[in-house]
């Protein structure tokens, strides 16, 4: 009965001259897995089949032109089938992890541009009423002050690349606390989260070269861990990971 089942599962295997190649290593591994089971429960006829499947076959001139027909045992079939199931489970698990990561980064409101705050009241409401998970970057500036225009342009670019971060700007004279933001401390960057000030940089333009751009500001903020991972990078990483699994 067992032999009849084995005959229904047939597959052709190339004869191998050595165990040093990848197929030889796989055959050795399968042999080890099968031999680790209770050998007393395997009929002699099936043992011979397993021995042939895990042992290299020598070739003469005639055999090199022919394929050697071998019978696959039920045990090896189940072993291979389990390997494929494990690979599929791993692929699904990693894909789910990547989707969860992307969902977390995409959760909450999206902005995408720099908000102009007109009054001190708007300034306070923006800080106090946003979700606690939202990072708020506020640029305190005045027209004609060195570095303010370049910083506004840089933040406009970053707002498009980090849509889950809220970028704002307000003139120092409109904050209601102009005495605290004198011209010599501009441009100033204030970063809030959960209604709390987590970082502030006065005269921030001094941290950059004479001419600076969005990439310079991005690198500066990343040094302090103030920006999340860009979504485009997450999507590219997800695609690469899925290709690696496949």
From Swiss-Prot:
One MF term in the entry's GO annotations: phospholipase inhibitor activity
Positions of region (Disordered): 1-70
Gene Ontology annotations for the cellular component aspect, listed alphabetically: cytosol; nucleus; photoreceptor inner segment; photoreceptor outer segment
Entry annotated with the keyword Nucleus: yes
Regions crossing the membrane: none
Keywords, comma-separated and alphabetical: Cell projection, Cilium, Cytoplasm, Nucleus, Phosphoprotein, Sensory transduction, Vision
BP term (GO), one: G protein-coupled receptor signaling pathway
Phosphoserine: modified positions: 73
Region named Thioredoxin fold: 111-246
Protein name: Phosducin
Organism for this UniProt entry: Homo sapiens (Human)
């Amino acid at each position: 009965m067992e032999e009849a089942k084995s005959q229904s599962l047939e597959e052709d295997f190339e004869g191998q001259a050595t165990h040093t190649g990848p197929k030889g290593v796989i055959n050795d591994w399968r042999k080890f897995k099968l031999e680790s089971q209770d050998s007393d429960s395997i009929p002699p006829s099936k043992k011979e089949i397993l021995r042939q499947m895990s042992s290299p076959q020598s070739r003469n001139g005639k055999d090199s032109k022919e394929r050697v027909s071998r019978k696959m045992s039920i045990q090896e079939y189940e072993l291979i089938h389990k390997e494929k199931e494990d690979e599929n489970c791993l692929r699904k698990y990693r894909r789910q992890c990547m989707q969860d990561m992307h969902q977390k980064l995409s959760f909450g409101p999206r902005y995408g541009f720099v908000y102009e705050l007109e009054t001190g009241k708007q300034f306070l409401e923006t800080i106090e009423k946003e979700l606690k998970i939202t990072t708020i970057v506020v640029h305190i500036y005045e027209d004609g002050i060195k570095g303010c225009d370049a910083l506004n342009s840089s933040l406009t670019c970053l707002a498009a690349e980090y849509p889950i971060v809220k970028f704002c700007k307000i003139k120092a004279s409109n904050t209601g606390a102009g005495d605290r933001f004198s011209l010599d401390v501009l441009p100033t960057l204030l970063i809030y989260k959960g209604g709390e000030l987590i970082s502030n940089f006065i005269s921030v333009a001094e941290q950059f070269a004479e001419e600076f751009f969005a990439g310079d500001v991005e690198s500066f903020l990343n040094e302090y861990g103030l920006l999340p991972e860009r979504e485009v990078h997450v999507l590219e990483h997800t695609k690469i990971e899925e290709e690696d699994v496949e």
